[in-house]
Amino acid sequence: MPSNTSAVPGTFGFMAAIRAEHPDIQSKLVSANKIIPNSYFKVYPTLHLSYKLSESRELQLNYSRRVRRPEGDELNPFPEYADPKNIRLGNPYLLPELIHSVNIGYQWQNDFFSLLPGLYYRYKYNGFTAITEIYQQDVLITSQRNLANDQALGADLVLNATVADKLNINFTPNAFYNQIDASNLGYGQKRSTWTWSANFNSNLTVGPATMIQVNSNYRSARLTPQGRYLPSFVLNMGLRQEVLKKKGSIYLTASDLFKTLRQNTRLNSPELIQRVSTKSNSRIIYLGFSYNFGRTRKKKDLQFDNSQ
């Protein structure tokens, strides 16, 4: 059961929480008539400390331990054929990913913007990674495995700003040094690189009933035990027009406006050299209408589908 306590002695702030779980999972492989047990007890604490420097400035220190569990398709060993030469399948022995993170930040805010730069360290145990192997002759098989560990040391920034009560901006760049250890998978040397990403979101109100939204995401190259994922970029746009005395709304959205969203993977290991580009039909134009029969609710941001 989660447990929370908080206290604010003077200009200091304190908040703590703890959550415990004890899953007892029995996975049955029917075709092999085999039971795979996965039973464990884990505790996930969270700690937040703050020191108020002034009405607009604050120092923060945070620690958390989190879990990311594998999804069904990552566990399902039934093969999925992307084409006759490439097979993907889940790994029923895949363990949950455990994440320890510590970050220190400085928050500065007023009526027009808030700024939160920070430094952080993140340690992942049993991190998920895709491994591609030669199955037979020229047929490849890809499945999920657990890394020994994945470490990141970096800096990030969260900027929120409002301009003339018409334009809201959110900008979150992130840069870090990443090191992965896949020695448990037979890859002896640790691999490391610098990488970065950035998210940009904006909402522009035009007149009393029109809102335009733009959001974009960029990620630089990221490591895998066998190579790397190459950089990716996506831009989405949308418009919402309120009608019928604000009881109704017309929505027009465009996901992946410039058709740049794709997953490019480059593998370069002693046993395999490969470059794969996966591209779905990600440019989706959506036109919709909604009508509220009851009390007017707070308008939500537009939704975009950037799944690959």
Predicted regions and their residues:
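Outer membrane beta-barrel strand-and-loop segments of large Gram-negative receptors
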Residues: 1-2, 95, 108-110, 114-172, ...
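C-terminal beta-signal and adjacent terminal beta-strands/loops
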Residues: 243-308
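Transmembrane beta-strands of outer-membrane beta-barrel pores
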Residues: 9, 20-26, 63-69, 78-79, ...
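Surface-exposed extracellular loop regions of Gram-negative outer-membrane beta-barrel proteins
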Residues: 1-32, 40-46, 55-100, 121-141, 166-177, 199-221, 257-271
